[in-house]
């Protein structure tokens, strides 16, 4: 999507189980201190110990101050996130709601939510294409993949494209542009269902 973007890979997943939240917080700080404009985190989780939640919250606030956009995909649990809280989220910081933070879920080719995705009228920001996405794979090959990870990568690509045309935009401003240029999905079952459509963003150029 954004051909000239540079990718910074920071591994925080141990290979099995869930990522260590201290490593996630340190990775966020490292990324923003080394010029990252768009940060993609692992899927949200419902288990966030209080002290570790504070580490991540402070790192996210630092990313907001440095002008980076932070994207996190939902889990595939068919859970209403307005009723069951998942982390990280934009309301977890004591200083106020994060303005640079986006929660994304996967949509199919028709822009509808995929089966089993988490949802929420106030806690989910946007849907992005995440079904049958052709991407790089192991062994210098390419193949199609589906899932929330693909959706977050799609959203990150569009955000990077906007940033490449307007480098002075902050993460908060890019978030606002993406939300306002998304295609409305009022007819679907999930409330406030919208998906990424990069064409309205491109029309700005």
Which residue stretches match the model-derived regions?
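C-terminal subdomain of the subtilisin-like protease fold in secreted/lumenal serine endopeptidases
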Residues: 36-41, 100-103, 166-205
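Extracellular S/T/G-rich loop segment that most often corresponds to the catalytic His/Ser-adjacent loop
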Residues: 65, 91-164, 168
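Active-site-proximal beta-strand/loop segments in catalytic clefts of secreted hydrolases
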Residues: 2-5, 10-14, 28, 41-46, ...
């Amino acid at each position: 999507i954004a051909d000239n973007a540079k990718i910074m890979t920071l591994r925080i997943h141990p290979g099995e189980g869930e990522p260590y939240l201290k490593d996630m917080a340190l990775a966020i700080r490292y990324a923003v201190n080394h010029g990252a404009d768009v940060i993609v985190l692992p899927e949200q989780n419902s288990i966030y110990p209080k002290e570790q939640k504070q580490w991540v919250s402070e790192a996210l606030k630092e990313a907001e101050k440095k002008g980076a956009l932070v994207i996190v995909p939902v889990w595939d649990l068919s859970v209403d996130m307005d009723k069951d809280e998942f982390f990280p989220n934009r309301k977890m910081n004591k200083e106020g709601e994060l303005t640079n933070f986006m929660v994304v879920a996967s949509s199919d080719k028709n822009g509808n939510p995929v089966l089993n995705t988490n949802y929420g009228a106030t806690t989910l920001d946007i849907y992005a294409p995440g079904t049958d996405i052709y991407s790089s794979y192991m062994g210098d090959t390419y193949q199609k993949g589906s899932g929330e990870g693909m959706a977050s990568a799609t959203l990150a690509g569009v955000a990077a494209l906007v940033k490449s045309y307007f480098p002075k935009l902050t993460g908060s401003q890019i978030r606002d542009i993406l939300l306002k240029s998304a295609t409305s999905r009022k007819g679907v079952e999930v409330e406030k269902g919208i998906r990424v459509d990069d064409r309205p963003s491109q029309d700005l150029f």
